[in-house]
Amino acid sequence: MKNICLLGATGSIGEQTLDVLRMHQDQFRLVSMTFGKNAEKAIPLIRTFQPKYIAVGDMDTYQKVKEASFSHECQIGIGEEGLIEAAVMDEVDIVVNALLGSVGLIPTLKAIEQKKTIALANKETLVTAGHIVKGHAKRYGVPLLPVDSEHSAIFQALQGEQCKNIERLVITASGGSFRDKTRQELESVTIADALNHPNWSMGAKITIDSATMMNKGLEVIEAHWLFDIPYEQIDVVLHKESIIHSMVEFHDRSVIAQLGNPDMRVPIQYALTYPDRLPLPETKRLELWEIGSLHFAKADFERFRCLQFAFESGKIGGTMPTVLNAANEEAVAAFLAGRISFLSIEDLIEQALDRHSVIQDPSLADIQEVDKDTRGYVNSILT
């Protein structure tokens, strides 16, 4: 029996993680969970899974949970302190970080210090502080298990292989909601258009990131840190069916790919069961004859400027990826609030990157200060 802490229980990854736990109640037990403000969704989950510890985003949500009736005893925490407490509980074996944004960084570091296995769906943790997180994981001997489908695919393809034999990583991208639109057509797209992803069921922020291809850019940076691969050996290819989740090419030109129907429960479960596998009967079996053909195209950096920003920021390193992430989070929030157009997301990110003076090998305090400064700058443009 593995004891699980789930950070971000009411988000898309959180919900699908709970699906996996529900299917394998003899294998996993939820001992702590966190969520932001969605008490209406969380309270039934608390009653079903009966975690010992719950952390919420603010005092209003705390009161709602406090006033709810549960058949079991549970403690309730608030904010970052609550996130940390949930992650470092003695009983916890695996911390699933399904939080949205850079808020996942500190709880992850604290969990690593307590030698908890990390199942990482929160890519911003590695984007903003990859050198710190990887250094921490190495120091404490803690595995970082990828939950993103692309990184899970690479991780699976590398089982039994030596990293020194890697020629390149090929990360696949659906192209998002607007993969067939020209830049001129993108000038008039709506929020509803952007949230209509063709293949995956995801939260609002990551769906917008998919439409701008920033999500793929963040995944490139994450792959760099997870697998210690230079950016020059990471490629992105458009693959609209989302059947091949990513590939590894070796020096002898052999390519190993991981395939499957788009279902996040597969990589989530693999992270929880690694190095073993369990049946996942609720996911659809891949029948290649039903698909018939698979399509690929080269990623156009002029068409997908956010992808270019990510590669450039990653290569520069230091605090530049922190600026990239913070500016993107604020710009996407502004778009979802109806304050800016879709293409303005790129413009705001570019302005934030252009003004930044990079700090190489930043401390955690440096990263937090740059993150705060960047968010303030982007919002000053918006007002």
Swiss-Prot record:
It catalyses: 2-C-methyl-D-erythritol 4-phosphate + NADP(+) = 1-deoxy-D-xylulose 5-phosphate + NADPH + H(+). Catalyzes the NADPH-dependent rearrangement and reduction of 1-deoxy-D-xylulose-5-phosphate (DXP) to 2-C-methyl-D-erythritol 4-phosphate (MEP). Pathway: Isoprenoid biosynthesis; isopentenyl diphosphate biosynthesis via DXP pathway; isopentenyl diphosphate from 1-deoxy-D-xylulose 5-phosphate: step 1/6. This is 1-deoxy-D-xylulose 5-phosphate reductoisomerase. Its cofactor is Mg(2+); Mn(2+). GO terms for molecular function: 1-deoxy-D-xylulose-5-phosphate reductoisomerase activity; manganese ion binding; NADPH binding. Belongs to the DXR family. The gene is dxr. NADPH binds at T10, G11, S12, I13, G36, K37, N38, N122, E124, G203. It is an enzyme of class 1 (oxidoreductase). Gene3D superfamilies: 1.10.1740.10, NAD(P)-binding Rossmann-like Domain. GO terms for biological process: isopentenyl diphosphate biosynthetic process, methylerythritol 4-phosphate pathway involved in terpenoid biosynthetic process. InterPro entries: DXP_reductoisomerase (IPR003821), DXP_reductoisomerase_C (IPR013644), DXP_reductoisomerase_N (IPR013512), DXPR_C (IPR026877), DXPR_C_sf (IPR036169), NAD(P)-bd_dom_sf (IPR036291). Keywords: Isoprene biosynthesis, Manganese, Metal-binding, NADP, Oxidoreductase. It comes from the Bacteria. Mn(2+) binds at D148, E150, E219. Its EC number is 1.1.1.267. PANTHER family: 1-DEOXY-D-XYLULOSE 5-PHOSPHATE REDUCTOISOMERASE, 1-DEOXY-D-XYLULOSE 5-PHOSPHATE REDUCTOISOMERASE, CHLOROPLASTIC. 1-deoxy-D-xylulose 5-phosphate binds at K123, S149, E150, S174, H197, S210, N215, K216, E219. It comes from Bacillus velezensis (strain DSM 23117 / BGSC 10A6 / LMG 26770 / FZB42) (Bacillus amyloliquefaciens subsp. plantarum).
